[in-house]
Amino acid sequence: MGLISGILFGIIFGVALMAGWSRMMTHRSSKRVAKAVDMKLLGSLSRDDLKKICGDNFPQWISFPAFEQVKWLNKLLSKMWPYIAEAATMVIRDSVEPLLEDYRPPGITSLKFSKLTLGNVAPKIEGIRVQSFKEGQVTMDVDLRWGGDPNIVLGVTALVASIPIQLKDLQVFTVARVIFQLADEIPCISAVVVALLAEPKPRIDYTLKAVGGSLTAIPGLSDMIDDTVDTIVKDMLQWPHRIVVPIGGIPVDLSDLELKPQGKLIVTVVKATNLKNKELIGKSDPYATIYIRPVFKYKTKAIENNLNPVWDQTFELIAEDKETQSLTVEVFDKDVGQDERLGLVKLPLSSLEAGVTKELELNLLSSLDTLKVKDKKDRGSITLKVHYHEFNKEEQMAALEDEKKIMEERKRLKEAGVIGSTMDAVGMVGSGLGAGVGMVGTGIGTGVGLVGSGVSSGVGMVGSGFGAVGSGLSKAGRFMGRTITGQSSKRSGSSTPVNTVPENDGAKQQ
């Protein structure tokens, strides 16, 4: 009896033990599944969602990294960099040199690479963020840092000197957006779109050093190069502008990837008030330049000896992306050599409502970069009338063709020597964008004009660096003419480039 009861007890105990073990494992498994579900749910919550749930008990140590680290990719990039650098050097030279020529500042006759190597230090990818905004595309944002040791020497030629300039201590901080257009054929990518995000703002730091000379040999050279680099980045690479690269030889329509005009901004530059005088004798001769993209820059006529000029000239500018682009207005004093800026202001297009005309009075600033603003004095204001018109499909295609025609006309006139650069501000001819452009060079254009004064007249060069007789002397002459002869000084003329269309023809008067 004792043996049988012992066997039964053992069987019952074993079954109970197995049942208990099975139940415990099932419970642990269900807890793991529930925990995984909770973690998945928490992982999908944003910082704001967690703050709503936790309230005042929200842990400050919780972070939400926007970019994933890719140490493996940095290791691969460092190994491949010598080969990438050598291949990229020719590509950069072939693609950037034409941009330097198109965007070179007035007064510089040549701007090319004398030396170009990318060095031995590879860029570092701080992180990658993969997103999907549109079907058939994969968008990848790359947080890029590069403190390399490239050897970059620019050959700079001006009217007064020729000097090689070395870019040292180059550092690049930017977030690049790379869009892959997917395809159903190997290599499964038909095109790549590359751009730099506007926010955070791309930062390119460097030091300029003259090789075998001095930067002072060409007055204002450092600022000219800074402006050129900044303009190329903003006008060619910074989103919404982009570079579209076909991949794999797959025939595909890339028109959807290219930047297209969204609308046009009709701007009437009405007047300026209480401008800052930059002249020792007489008053400034102000004119205004306006642009959304620096390569499509237009200017008003110059009003002589007036700190409260009234222009009342209208221009039409194409906008590619209303949400990210801005209208920039700069006021200059027309002078011999380099025209001096009196002030500038920027108006975001996102603040405008389509189909509504606004009249705005905007205060002029010494710089758009608040960190560089040293002069806090009032620089006056400028009054604008603005109207944003959104394009339909037909208007969009017509505007795209007009942009091409304008660029071709600018390049043709640059080659003919009528303007010094495609970046020169010009006046618009006719009522539409397709009517063409009349070229009126900036203060550093080329040409010969008659310079009159209240006392005498003469011939002066409109140029940079060597304008011995020009608007500066004509101002003195006009001042003396007004002082001595009164009304006879009204015949004083300003420098007018030959073989050009008068500026007044370019503006629609209101």
From Swiss-Prot:
A Pfam family that the UniProt record links to this protein: C2
Region (Phospholipid binding): 226-488
Gene Ontology cellular component annotations, sorted alphabetically: endoplasmic reticulum; nuclear membrane; plasma membrane
Cofactor: Ca(2+)
Inactivation phenotype: Enhanced drought and salt tolerance and modified gravitropic response associated with an increased expression of THAS1. Higher root lengths.
TM region positions: 1-21
Function in brief: May be involved in membrane trafficking. Acts as a repressor of abiotic stress (e.g. drought and salt) responses by binding specifically to the promoter of THAS1 to regulate its transcription. Binds to membrane lipid ceramides.
UniProt record similarity statement: Belongs to the synaptotagmin family.
UniProt protein name: Calcium-dependent lipid-binding protein
